[in-house]
């Protein structure tokens, strides 16, 4: 690990240890070490499409995809009492599988393993409602309901996949929570996202306008590079575990490094 990267890890850990309302924001880049492709990386879905190439192959069968050290690092930050809220653009369910609490998570594009009720907005796993995709399909909003398909256990409303497809409305509750916590944040940590998709790309701007420090951890450029207080271009799995370990050391020592306090 280079001296520069060590300094960046130390700086990020100092700000996180001193923070009162840390918000993390994750994109597809956090899941590449689990075997999923990203979108705008060197071998990403959109990068290959723009070059006239076929989509990238998944590194593992879907049934073998598991949370990686980066997902578990965010769980540790939450359990330390530092990470107050997590915003994610991902639908891969890896944050929940890693043990991150649902009530502190806004999945802006839904979750491929969860269904939700159109009437009361309750969310369920496929198993909780007995949704068999071989019988009922994916359950997207645009699909015609089938006779006898499972209904919401709470209100008997229609349940659909929580995944947001093109043309679907974004989940209002999650969007509202994401903006609220972005505005409250004193450190906004964007991880593995190119920050170009709206309205998610407005959240770091809201955080900056509210006085938060912006940390970017991403391979490749983002529209916020010049505005970030700290930009780390390195592997996510290489950076997050030592950041968390350093945060633990700082919290254990009761130390907030000089100049790393809230502002």
Question: Which residues are covered by each model-predicted region?
Answer:
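Conserved catalytic core of sirtuin-type NAD+-dependent deacylases
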Residues: 1-263
